[in-house]
């Protein structure tokens, strides 16, 4: 751009100097006009670099050029002046409407110069002027192409800057995602450790505590009553066996939790329970289980495990049924056994733990028990809205 700047100024000043060679010595008006034109060209050349009022400075340059052609009709030097003016005009990138208006005005001025030239010299210089004007057109095309090239460079720079900013933002997002994934992994590991610790504490830990109490009681009964001691030994064996069963069932449940298919996990769990406990178990599913969130799978599996264990251990059930219903709004899980039932029973560790797991997911569990009519676990999980509810075991004991 600097080269074009100085070349334009050099061309205009040289053209003005060449006009001095054709002016007669007694034509003082010609000298004054050339000096004024050169001064205005120089001033406009500096002012044209500003963004404001650029169109007016271009119009002044065009008017000065055609004025030289009108004042000195016997030479085509004014066309040389118009060449850098045309380049500068199209280089500014004016709107199409403005450009066409200026072209129409320039055509009128050029036609005026041609008429004056024809009136004074005939066809001698008119044809030369028309031929030379093609160079002005060529310079205008060159200026337009340079403007497009500069616009393309500006667009490329802007796109490169945007691409660089996007790359930096993407790198930062990738780093944040990596840190987030690491945090999720750590939190998942902590959650699993806490969950396993809670399972051990609430199941095996409870049994081992009861076993320790019975062993301490056994020591006292050995000194006082051998029959009571034998009964206590039987209780200790039962507690130890139940604790071992809890450990085995917990291990199998943890293995099934890693299975991506919830239905297959529940089927395997009920099948193992049927084989080990000798309880007839029925498992039914309605709706599409694919809508169940993965985060809810362990809770459903643990709920079924705890309900089946209680059915055999506390209810002495011979048959159990599991019904899983899936809708777009909620998940319903009902486990019912045909055990002896106990409507007056308080919530033990297993049932309380079951309610805690459901509450973590905004679910609700109700326990229904009727004497000699078994025990029912009703679990509801809303997929649209979370709901927290608290209440005791519902009693349905008949007065017979």
Swiss-Prot record:
MF (Gene Ontology): ATP binding; phosphorelay sensor kinase activity; protein dimerization activity; protein kinase activity
SUPFAM superfamilies named among the record's database cross-references: ATPase domain of HSP90 chaperone/DNA topoisomerase II/histidine kinase (SSF55874)
Transmembrane segments: 3-23, 28-48, 62-82, 102-122, 126-146
The keyword ATP-binding is annotated on this UniProt entry: yes
Catalysed reaction equations from the record: ATP + protein L-histidine = ADP + protein N-phospho-L-histidine
Cytoplasmic side: 24-27, 83-101, 147-400
UniProt main location, coarse: membrane
Ranges for domain Histidine kinase: 190-385
Processing and modification events after translation: Autophosphorylated.
Impact when changing residue 201 to N: Mutant is sensitive to linearmycins
PANTHER family xref list: NITRATE/NITRITE SENSOR PROTEIN NARX-RELATED, NITRATE_NITRITE SENSOR PROTEIN NARQ
Name this protein carries in UniProt: Sensor histidine kinase LnrJ
């Amino acid at each position: 751009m600097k080269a074009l700047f100085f070349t334009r100024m050099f061309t205009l000043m040289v053209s003005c100097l060449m006009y001095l060679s054709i002016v007669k010595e007694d034509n003082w008006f010609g000298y004054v006009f050339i000096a004024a034109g050169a001064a205005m060209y120089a001033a406009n050349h500096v002012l044209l670099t500003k963004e404001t009022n650029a169109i007016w400075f271009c119009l002044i340059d065009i008017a000065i050029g055609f004025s030289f052609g009108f004042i000195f009709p016997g030479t085509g030097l004014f066309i040389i002046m118009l060449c850098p003016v045309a380049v500068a005009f199209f280089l500014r990138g004016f709107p199409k409407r403005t450009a066409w208006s200026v072209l129409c005005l320039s055509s009128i001025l050029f036609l005026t110069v041609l008429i004056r030239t024809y009136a004074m010299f005939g066809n001698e210089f008119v044809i030369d002027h028309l031929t030379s004007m093609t160079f002005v057109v060529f310079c205008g095309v060159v200026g337009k192409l340079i403007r497009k090239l500069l616009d393309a460079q500006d667009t490329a720079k802007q796109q490169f800057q945007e691409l660089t900013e996007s790359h930096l933002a993407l790198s930062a997002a990738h780093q944040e995602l990596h840190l987030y994934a690491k945090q999720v992994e750590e939190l998942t590991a902590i959650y699993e450790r806490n969950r396993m610790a809670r399972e051990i504490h609430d199941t095996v830990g409870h049994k081992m505590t009861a076993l320790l109490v019975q062993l301490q009681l056994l020591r006292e009964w050995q000194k006082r009553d051998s029959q009571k001691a034998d009964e206590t030994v039987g209780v200790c064996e039962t507690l130890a066996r139940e604790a071992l069963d809890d450990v085995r069932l917990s291990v199998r449940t943890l293995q099934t939790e890693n299975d991506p298919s919830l239905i297959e996990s529940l089927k395997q769990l009920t099948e193992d329970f049927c084989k080990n406990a000798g309880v007839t178990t029925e498992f039914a599913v309605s709706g599409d289980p694919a809508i169940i969130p993965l985060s809810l799978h362990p809770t459903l599996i643990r709920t079924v495990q705890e309900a089946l264990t209680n059915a055999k251990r506390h209810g002495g059930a011979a048959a159990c049924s599991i019904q899983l219903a899936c809708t777009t709004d909620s998940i319903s899980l009902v486990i019912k056994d045909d055990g002896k039932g106990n409507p007056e029973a308080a919530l033990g560790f297993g049932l309380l733990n079951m309610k805690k797991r459901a509450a973590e997911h905004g679910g609700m569990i109700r326990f229904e028990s009727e004497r000699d009519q078994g025990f029912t676990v009703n679990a509801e999980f809303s997929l649209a809205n979370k709901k927290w509810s608290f209440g005791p075991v519902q009693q349905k004991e008949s007065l017979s």
